[in-house]
Amino acid sequence: MAVSARPARAPRGPDKVKKDKAAQTSGPRQGSQMGKLLGFEWTDVSSWERLVTLLNRPTDPASLAVFRFLFGLMMVLDIPQERGLSSLDRRYLDGLEVCRFPLLDALQPLPLDWMYLVYTIMFLGALGMMLGLCYRISCVLFLLPYWYVFLLDKTSWNNHSYLYGLLAFQLTFVDAHHYWSVDGLLRARKRNAHVPLWNYAVLRGQIFIVYFIAGIKKLDADWVEGYSMEYLSRHWLFSPFKLVLSEEMTSLLVVHWCGLLLDLSAGFLLFFDASRPIGFVFVSYFHCMNSQLFSIGMFPYVMLASSPLFCSPEWPRKLVAHCPKKLQELLPLRTAPQPSTSCMYKRSRARGSQKPGLRHQLSTAFTLLYLLEQLFLPYSHFLTQGYNNWTNGLYGYSWDMMVHSRSHQHVKITYRDGRTGELGYLNPGVFTQSRRWKDHADMLKQYATCLSRLLPKYNVTEPQIYFDIWVSINDRFQQRIFDPRVDIVQAAWSPFQRTPWLQPLLMDLSPWRTKLQEIKSSLDNHTEVVFIADFPGLHLENFVSEDLGNTSIQLLQGEVTVELVAEQKNQTLQEGEKMQLPAGEYHKVYTVSSSPSCYMYIYVNTTEVALEQDLAYLQELKEKVENGSETGPLPPELQPLLEGEVKGGPEPTPLVQTFLRRQQRLQEIERRRNAPFYERFVRFLLRKLFIFRRSFLMTCISLRNLALGRPSLEQLAQEVTYANLRPFEPAGEPSPVNTDSSNPNPPEPDSHPVHSEF
């Protein structure tokens, strides 16, 4: 599969150099159909010795070196951004009371200045990897800090960050510095030398697994039926498809089905020579789209850089051969590679054939074991059952990319003083820098344990912590994910046993999604709906905001009793029945049926509707005055409508101020949308420049602190203020709310107010 490589050969051209004899006899016999298709014969894998010979066959190092350079460059760019160097002081500020989520509780961050040193070592390692300078050492200098930072925070885990660590691990063992490297300039033995075929096989196999396993995971019914990413088709990138398809069909056919087919076929398309051009077109288009659809850092570009690994290894030499001769002097060598001790070469019959050495056998075993391990890990969740929730395993190493989308409607954290019995509530996410803990039992256990250590500082002794978390996955009902009656501080949790306080996903209710969509589509623009499913014996305590002047609850399945707390009244609802809920009051919904209940809140934000009507009136009045159809004078408090801003005179009403702010915001959006390409590109570069500038300055400050000691707090404050300046951005340019592109948990959109009062 991953060993399709032709024997190394020099490119054709006027400066062609003959191959060395060893290389001439090292290639596979490609006379048969199998040899032409796969690059090796059946006899090459018919025994262990022949397999070792095949995987250690001399191969051109050119393509491997190009990937090394590009991957190192991507990591140099990634460290200040997604790895978080630019915002390191916000994450690991000394003395900060924060709950962290490492893989192992014993793994803790170093003091802030030392964390900057760790990131500096990682950055220098990535730079050395890119240049091929002290290559092995550079790979280790990048690899160890990378995995330390990665394992330090489970909330930032994702598939591509895991992939970076795997690729860096592989590059540590392969000979990617045998071409186009500083090491090659300094050591003639390393310069332009063959690499064994397994160097390509392990990298190709890894990329193939990423694509193929991602495709297999997308065979999930939710993905095939179009529920996983149903809102993605609203993006402007899918506008061409919506010329011939509806938005729903674009989501189903283009986003979901084409995404499934691409992941399943991408590895095969890239592997075979005949289909590789088609594969290049599809995967390049796919990754370019992903770079615009998602905030996933360097991942699309790393995958684009990995695609040429499937080409003939000598393709860079062919590219150099077509460059002008004056430019060729600055580019990598075109000459044929020299022999390397890492490879096995065929000798003449008279002298016999070379026997595999221990080094060759170990490298072959490493390749096979590594690829088998990568095939096993995505399906190893039966071993680590404690990390299984509604989806299997810790998110990041299963390649189930974008298969599950979640929305959190309601999160309540209750604490009880173990001595006094006093109850209280915590703001969800207090003492954390993330929100991913809501979906994972292992993180919830860590969070509860951390809260139990912090709350005694606030006069809460022996705290008991209870979580009531409502989640919808792939457009299902909102339902509880954990039992709200269990004290998580004392609850049992093991990485190798099923979590007993995890509530099951109500898969039997999945067919309701079609009906739920029909209900949504039947409502007008001002009416909102929230669908709830709850377990027998549990109840939901809720508060209806005073802004929601028209709120009702309707039962879809099962039986519930609704208690109006202030009125001390109860009403039981049967299937299809509905009742009005008073605004500004608490109520409780008890599930009294023997099976899960399903109901929905239907509400209208009357305050928002009235505001929209008033703003529409002001907009209409403004247009009438501007076109001359309104001849009467405006009251003084409405004069800012024409001027666009407040310029003395009577203070405008709050409504007018709201209208002016909305107008300014809409004008700014329109200006940015219609800005020329160069202006948007410059804005993009300035934002990136700020990230790299702040990363550099804060690193210098911390390294100075380690070397010379910390200065006074006043001087430190001045230095940090200078690092936070944006000297390159034009005046009046609004700064983004959060410049930390490393944050894997951006703020959630506002939840429906029916369930967000806690």
Curated annotation (Swiss-Prot):
<keyword id="KW-0472">Membrane</keyword>
<feature type="topological domain" description="Cytoplasmic">
    <location>
        <begin position="2"/>
        <end position="60"/>
    </location>
</feature>
<feature type="transmembrane region" description="Helical">
    <location>
        <begin position="114"/>
        <end position="134"/>
    </location>
</feature>
<dbReference type="InterPro" id="IPR011051">
    <property type="entry name" value="RmlC_Cupin_sf"/>
</dbReference>
<dbReference type="Pfam" id="PF22777">
    <property type="entry name" value="VKGC_lumenal_dom"/>
</dbReference>
<dbReference type="GO" id="GO:0008488">
    <property type="term" value="F:gamma-glutamyl carboxylase activity"/>
</dbReference>
<feature type="transmembrane region" description="Helical">
    <location>
        <begin position="137"/>
        <end position="157"/>
    </location>
</feature>
<feature type="topological domain" description="Cytoplasmic">
    <location>
        <begin position="314"/>
        <end position="361"/>
    </location>
</feature>
<keyword id="KW-1015">Disulfide bond</keyword>
<keyword id="KW-1133">Transmembrane helix</keyword>
<feature type="compositionally biased region" description="Basic and acidic residues">
    <location>
        <begin position="12"/>
        <end position="22"/>
    </location>
</feature>
<feature type="topological domain" description="Cytoplasmic">
    <location>
        <begin position="135"/>
        <end position="136"/>
    </location>
</feature>
<feature type="topological domain" description="Lumenal">
    <location>
        <begin position="383"/>
        <end position="758"/>
    </location>
</feature>
<feature type="region of interest" description="Disordered">
    <location>
        <begin position="726"/>
        <end position="758"/>
    </location>
</feature>
<keyword id="KW-0007">Acetylation</keyword>
<feature type="compositionally biased region" description="Basic and acidic residues">
    <location>
        <begin position="749"/>
        <end position="758"/>
    </location>
</feature>
<comment type="subunit">
    <text>Monomer. May interact with CALU.</text>
</comment>
<keyword id="KW-0256">Endoplasmic reticulum</keyword>
<dbReference type="Pfam" id="PF05090">
    <property type="entry name" value="HTTM"/>
</dbReference>
<keyword id="KW-0456">Lyase</keyword>
<feature type="modified residue" description="N-acetylalanine">
    <location>
        <position position="2"/>
    </location>
</feature>
<feature type="topological domain" description="Lumenal">
    <location>
        <begin position="158"/>
        <end position="292"/>
    </location>
</feature>
<dbReference type="InterPro" id="IPR053935">
    <property type="entry name" value="VKGC_lumenal_dom"/>
</dbReference>
<feature type="transmembrane region" description="Helical">
    <location>
        <begin position="362"/>
        <end position="382"/>
    </location>
</feature>
<comment type="function">
    <text>Mediates the vitamin K-dependent carboxylation of glutamate residues to calcium-binding gamma-carboxyglutamate (Gla) residues with the concomitant conversion of the reduced hydroquinone form of vitamin K to vitamin K epoxide. Catalyzes gamma-carboxylation of various proteins, such as blood coagulation factors (F2, F7, F9 and F10), osteocalcin (BGLAP) or matrix Gla protein (MGP).</text>
</comment>
<feature type="compositionally biased region" description="Polar residues">
    <location>
        <begin position="23"/>
        <end position="33"/>
    </location>
</feature>
<feature type="region of interest" description="Disordered">
    <location>
        <begin position="1"/>
        <end position="34"/>
    </location>
</feature>
<keyword id="KW-0812">Transmembrane</keyword>
<dbReference type="GO" id="GO:0005789">
    <property type="term" value="C:endoplasmic reticulum membrane"/>
</dbReference>
<protein>
    <recommendedName>
        <fullName>Vitamin K-dependent gamma-carboxylase</fullName>
        <ecNumber>4.1.1.90</ecNumber>
    </recommendedName>
</protein>
<dbReference type="InterPro" id="IPR053934">
    <property type="entry name" value="HTTM_dom"/>
</dbReference>
<feature type="topological domain" description="Lumenal">
    <location>
        <begin position="82"/>
        <end position="113"/>
    </location>
</feature>
<dbReference type="InterPro" id="IPR007782">
    <property type="entry name" value="VKG_COase"/>
</dbReference>
<feature type="transmembrane region" description="Helical">
    <location>
        <begin position="293"/>
        <end position="313"/>
    </location>
</feature>
<comment type="similarity">
    <text>Belongs to the vitamin K-dependent gamma-carboxylase family.</text>
</comment>
<feature type="disulfide bond">
    <location>
        <begin position="99"/>
        <end position="450"/>
    </location>
</feature>
<dbReference type="InterPro" id="IPR011020">
    <property type="entry name" value="HTTM-like"/>
</dbReference>
<dbReference type="GO" id="GO:0019842">
    <property type="term" value="F:vitamin binding"/>
</dbReference>
<feature type="transmembrane region" description="Helical">
    <location>
        <begin position="61"/>
        <end position="81"/>
    </location>
</feature>
